[in-house]
């Protein structure tokens, strides 16, 4: 019955070329641009926060704004290497263990946000320790601007017609070119809204309104918790990766499994930051 109703209520997929422009053999994709925009925005916004001395404990930023100029390369390597290795380990290990030469083929797709955040976290720890910067404040500085990049990348996922949602009869369901004959939830846009706009707004209020940068680790904890909760919510509408499917009961996905520890870790980081602030009060 639902199959007969779906076609009349769904939306056609917008004809947007995944390639923005070409220069000879070089093709610039929306997906790649999303990562560039995300890194550059986090860099710019982080420097803005560091220049606003009143946001930090004792009006003393944890580092000079110029330090982020050096961190950009570290961040890019952490995102790309962590994202790729995470995808290989979490989502398609059996394929890549049999085809190791395919691991560096980033142009064929396959990145994991959970791997990307692990790679970036490692880069932040190494960078902060090499410069004598408080690690928790380093986390806060970067985390505050990350949601914008997440939102842009999710929109790029939509343009690429990838990571689409489950079959649905909602009026805004979309016929994806490679998503089969039935319309699906545009779950990429749900993620762009929750992980991008909503999460950035929450962190913006915590930073500029509640002045939570004065409590090292709180903003980073809020980001990790917010992302984890957003991802878990959207996983109920997102089609699981074909090579994995559901892990349990027709509802549990790998995205959920990887996000639950993030929520717990983020809650712990916020609790720790509040407790430290209370002790120093």
From Swiss-Prot:
- What topology in the membrane does the UniProt record assign? Multi-pass membrane protein
Q: Which domain of life is it from?
A: Bacteria
Instruction: State the pathway, as annotated in the record.
Output: Protein modification; lipoprotein biosynthesis (diacylglyceryl transfer)
Any one Gene Ontology MF annotation carried by this entry is: phosphatidylglycerol-prolipoprotein diacylglyceryl transferase activity
What is one GO cellular-component annotation here?
Answer: plasma membrane
Q: What is this protein called?
A: Phosphatidylglycerol--prolipoprotein diacylglyceryl transferase
Which organism is this entry from? Brucella canis (strain ATCC 23365 / NCTC 10854 / RM-666)
Instruction: Please give the biological process terms from Gene Ontology that the record holds.
Output: lipoprotein biosynthetic process
